[in-house]
């Protein structure tokens, strides 16, 4: 497994990262909404109260069936910076966001779901980084996930900024084949976003594909040590609507396929990155297969589906990092694999390694 480290193009110390951007640069916050009237006021307020930037809030309602449009009208009447877009046809979150992008006037743009919020000073921190580095088209930081009441505290003092070459960041994402960004913590340079195009019609991986497309066209910045957004987890949220593992694998594969066959990048480089991502996804699928064998679920429709997926992306499974373990569990069979001490220890190490990678991602953004 590749190391989760990148050589930074540039770093900025705390003393400079804490300086607000000069001249109040303009930011468009595009809030997409469907039946979230109860959350809208908090989301809009979190954007309107941002300091050191000139904010416009574009609320795109996707033909909600609740009282969202009334709430939006009241919010717009109370502050001229709120611009409603009321869709006449329900088109889903991708179409709603793209409508907001088309209407945006800001130098920078943030996509905010109606149930999420920006932390105090979030936009100023991200904009400060982007203003220092004109080649950066994507800035992100740490999102805080919460249930219930909105948190009252957040880390608002950055410890620094880190900038990576977009191609290096993208290569690591392909090597790991995992999305490291939630969404509300992202700030995009509007000119770069419009150059690469808006979101594409993927079910759950539309944001992941967009982040990678931006990285293919620009450098990537990270606000270190600060919380950039609050992401609400609740039963109705899109992110909380559980996607089964196999569907998630397929949708990530679709995102890589769509990105690297769109003709917008270098053909040779895109082909290499697609092979890298496909191998990583296939390796993840056979890892889940071996873990299932150790848990007593080997040689089942579940593992058959994982292996079918893996072979579709990378036919020679023996060449993958987990290929030897796969051969071992298949040779032993479900019962013997479940009783194997060495396989059990290996499964524990695999799980601990995944937990460490998650913790590292939360700390470094990678």
Predicted regions and their residues:
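Cell-envelope/extracellular polymer assembly enzymes that use nucleotide-activated donors
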Residues: 25-28, 56, 209
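C-terminal subregions of glycosyltransferases and related glycan-biosynthesis enzymes
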Residues: 1-22, 175, 233-366
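A conserved acidic beta->alpha catalytic loop
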Residues: 61-70, 89, 113
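Short, acidic, metal-binding catalytic loop of nucleotide-sugar glycosyltransferases
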Residues: 45-54
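Conserved nucleotide-sugar donor-binding catalytic segment
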Residues: 161-252
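Glycine-rich, basic loop-to-helix element that forms the pyrophosphate-binding segment
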Residues: 87-104
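Short aromatic/hydrophobic "clamp" motif used to bind/position activated sugar donors
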Residues: 109
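Flexible acidic/His/Gly-enriched loops in nucleotide-sugar-dependent glycosyltransferase catalytic domains
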Residues: 123-192, 196, 260
């Amino acid at each position: 497994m590749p190391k989760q480290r990148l050589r930074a193009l540039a770093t900025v110390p705390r003393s400079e990262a804490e300086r607000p951007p000069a001249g109040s640069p303009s930011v468009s916050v595009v809030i997409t909404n469907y039946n979230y009237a109860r959350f809208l006021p908090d989301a809009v307020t979190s954007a309107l109260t941002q300091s050191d930037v000139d904010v416009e809030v574009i609320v795109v309602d996707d033909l909600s069936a609740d009282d969202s449009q009334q709430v939006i009208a009241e919010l717009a009447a109370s502050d001229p910076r709120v611009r409603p877009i009321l869709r006449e046809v329900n088109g889903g979150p991708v179409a709603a966001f793209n409508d907001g992008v088309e209407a945006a006037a800001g130098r920078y743009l943030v996509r905010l779901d109606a149930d999420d919020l920006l932390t105090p000073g979030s936009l100023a921190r991200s904009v400060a980084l982007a203003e220092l580095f004109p080649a950066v088209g994507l800035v992100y930081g740490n999102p805080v996930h919460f249930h219930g009441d909105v948190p009252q505290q957040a880390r608002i003092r950055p410890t620094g900024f880190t900038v990576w070459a977009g191609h290096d960041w993208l290569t690591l994402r392909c090597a790991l084949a995992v999305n490291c960004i939630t969404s509300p913590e992202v700030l995009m340079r509007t000119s770069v976003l419009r150059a690469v195009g808006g979101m594409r019609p993927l079910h759950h991986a539309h944001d992941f594909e967009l982040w990678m497309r931006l990285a293919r066209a620009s450098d990537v910045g990270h606000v270190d040590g600060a919380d950039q957004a609050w992401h609400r987890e609740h039963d109705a949220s899109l992110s909380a609507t559980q996607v089964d593992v196999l569907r998630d694998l397929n949708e990530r594969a679709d995102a890589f396929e769509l990105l690297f066959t769109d003709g917008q990048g270098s053909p040779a480089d895109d082909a290499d990155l697609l092979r890298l991502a496909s191998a990583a996804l296939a390796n993840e699928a056979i890892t889940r297969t071996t873990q299932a064998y150790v848990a007593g679920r080997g040689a089942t429709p579940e593992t058959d589906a994982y292996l079918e997926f893996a072979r579709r992306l990378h036919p020679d499974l023996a060449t993958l990092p987990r290929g030897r373990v796969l051969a071992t569990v298949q040779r032993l069979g479900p019962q013997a694999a479940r009783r194997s001490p060495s396989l059990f220890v290996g499964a524990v190490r695999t799980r601990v390694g995944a937990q460490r990678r998650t913790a590292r991602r939360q700390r470094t953004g990678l």
